[in-house]
UniProtKB/Swiss-Prot annotation:
HAMAP family: CsrA. Pfam families: CsrA (PF02599). The keyword Lyase does not apply. It comes from Geobacillus kaustophilus (strain HTA426). It comes from the Bacteria. Keywords: Bacterial flagellum biogenesis, Cytoplasm, Repressor, RNA-binding, Translation regulation. InterPro entries: CsrA, CsrA_sf. GO terms for molecular function: mRNA 5'-UTR binding. This is Translational regulator CsrA. Its main location: cytoplasm. Belongs to the CsrA/RsmA family. It is found in: Cytoplasm. GO terms for cellular component: cytosol.
């Protein structure tokens, strides 16, 4: 992990397109401003992890639904009703 120290109003550049600036320091909180292209998704880590968990759950539900549908189609193709 790269560790950098920045003061108020100082910035960090990531590649050509992303700039992170320290906007406010209040006690134990730091407010950051992030300039990045619109196609770059930026989330707080806890939000990112929640999105990943929801996507994984949706993927599993979709797989289960697809498996059920496949079984029903097999029964119908064989002349049997599910």
């Amino acid at each position: 992990m790269l560790v950098l120290t920045r003061k108020l109003k100082e910035a960090i550049q990531i590649g050509d397109d992303i700039e992170i600036t320290v906007l406010v320091i209040q006690g134990d909180q730091v407010k950051l401003g992030i300039n990045a292209p619109k196609h770059v998704e930026i989330h707080r880590k806890e939000i990112y992890l929640a999105i990943q968990a929801e996507n994984n759950a949706a993927s599993f539900a979709s797989k289960t639904s697809l498996e059920r549908l496949t079984e029903q189609l097999k029964h119908l193709k064989g002349g049997k009703q599910a």
